[in-house]
């Protein structure tokens, strides 16, 4: 799917179709390309003068965040949160050529959707009138805010998990901890890579950015550093919670083994006595005594009581 938003030379915001675009007629054009078909990708390539193979780089989810300079365009790869069954990350390709900014991605990125909504419902000139560098900043800022929202929500989830953990071991809690830890691993790696991109953007790497744009990128850089620290801290908390969960499971298992051992020990001597009386000896004590059965039973009860007393004194039960 291809969406085009542009600001005309008279300052009006329009949404022309790709075929209708004439780059000379607009001050700034933003094309967003989401999960394009081969035909759409070929049409886009022909229109903007960037090869299909170059465009496919932006669609590769495994691409590492970076800034590249080609003969007539700049390529920025940036990592954004991906909301599926588990929250992970995906790659966003950003191409800048003259007055064109192209975002291309194979997965749905919520930050892009929010920016579209901002442009359609509020004053779009805030985003477009200050140049292509400011539009780039807004895109990266929305992605950074997505990370921030998720990590802030994660803080509440961690408190909830701690309460459940203190209430007792639960397999669902362990699965939730593993899922969150996986998310934080993806986030931490992606944020570190995004930080490296922002280092380049705030150091005059792109000639299309103004001094104000570079100051904005510097703010984003420090915001990203904060998010990296948050993700590292939360990951350590989750690791500690995993250790506690495993310890609780081991304690529970030890309790079960202790109970089984005590039961086995308590009944070992009575079973030994009954085993002896089950043998075919010609003579056994109390075998011919009318009260023999009850005496033997009483002996076994006494032995059991002695074991129970010993275990209680030892604090095992």
Swiss-Prot record:
- InterPro entries, per database record: CorA_cytoplasmic_dom (IPR045861), CorA_TM1_TM2 (IPR045863), Mg/Co-transport_prot_CorA (IPR004488), MgTranspt_CorA/ZnTranspt_ZntB (IPR002523)
Activity regulation, in the record's words, is: Inhibited by cation hexaammines.
Residues on the membrane's Cytoplasmic side span 1-258, 312-317
Q: How does it assemble?
A: Homopentamer. In the absence of Mg(2+), interactions between subunits are weakened, and dimers, trimers and tetramers can be observed in vitro. Was initially proposed to be a homotetramer, based on the cross-linking studies. This is in contradiction with current 3D-structures that clearly show it is a homopentamer.
| Keywords recorded for this protein, A-Z | Cell membrane, Ion transport, Magnesium, Membrane, Transmembrane, Transmembrane helix, Transport
The molecule here is called: Cobalt/magnesium transport protein CorA
Top-rank lineage group of the source organism: Archaea
Please tell me which stretches of this chain the record labels as motif Probable selectivity filter. Answer: 278-280
Per the record, what ranges lie on the membrane's Extracellular side? 280-290
**Site feature: Important for closing the ion permeation pathway in the closed state:** 260
Q: Where are the transmembrane segments?
A: 259-279, 291-311
Q: Mind telling me which GO cellular component terms the entry cites?
A: plasma membrane
Site: Essential for ion permeation. Where?
254
Annotated membrane topology? Multi-pass membrane protein
Record-marked site positions (Threonine that confers selectivity for Co(2+) transport) = 261
- Record function comment: Mediates influx of magnesium ions. Alternates between open and closed states. Activated by low cytoplasmic Mg(2+) levels. Inactive when cytoplasmic Mg(2+) levels are high.
* Localization per record: Cell membrane
